Structures are given as structure tokens and as C-alpha cells.
């Protein structure tokens, strides 16, 4: 699977661990940065990762900052994106099963490395249920963009 990633300086270390973990599993990762600890603005990195998903260049995307809040808001500003801020495995599973999210956000100051990788594995590995009631709700949600 081709997965976009993006982060700010506050989540660089965790992003690098997530990227290495995904690549080890055989996923192709497109890393939109940041690549240094220099202070930077999360919207540009989150938006770049989200645009890659929205355009179809990548199938899914993962964005990170210290809390995950800023990058999730930024990603959700891009048409076609459904980004969930995740801090537990149950939500990672349910947001794929019911909401067919195409992006997820993590807070490096909220989840540790082990939990983050477990969340990533669950989210990446869970398919949308395809149930009519969930698709109907997603369609209504996406219609709000128009």
C-alpha cells in the first residue's frame, strides 16, 4: 500500500519510527516531512500528505504533531479527506470499519511508540465494512463539502 506521511518538528522522531515500521512491512511511504527538528508550521506538511491521498497518489495517509489536533484539522480541510485523530486501538479499528477514514493523526506527546505502532497496524490493516448504513452516512458526510 502507498501511504503518505507528514509531521511537524514535535513529532519527527515518532514519524521516523512509523515510516521505518511501515516500510519494514512492505508499504511504500511518501514522506512529506518535516525532516529536521527546526520549528515549522504543521499545516503545510499535513496538507501535502492529505493532498496526496485526495488526488489518489497515495491510498492512505498518516499525519503527526505533538497532540495530533493541528494536523488532523489541517488534513480535514482538504476535500475528500476523512482524518481521524487516534489514541487507542479500538478507535483505530472502528474508524476504518464504520467511517472508512483515509487518513489518521497521532499525537507524539499523547501516545508512546509502542501504542502508536499498534494503532497504525490496526488502522492500516482494517478494511471498511461496506455496510449500507455506514456508506450512507459517509455519503452524507462527504456531501457537506459541497
Where is each model-derived feature located?
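Helix-adjacent hinge/juxtasegments
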Residues: 45-85
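C-terminal binding/interaction regions
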Residues: 4, 10-11, 89-146
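Glycine-rich phosphate/diphosphate-binding loop of Rossmann-like nucleotide-binding domains
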Residues: 5-24
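A general structural signal for well-ordered alpha-helical segments in protein cores
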Residues: 15, 42, 46, 72, ...
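A short beta-strand-loop structural module common to alpha/beta enzyme folds
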Residues: 28-39
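SAM-dependent methyltransferases
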Residues: 1-2, 23, 49, 144-146
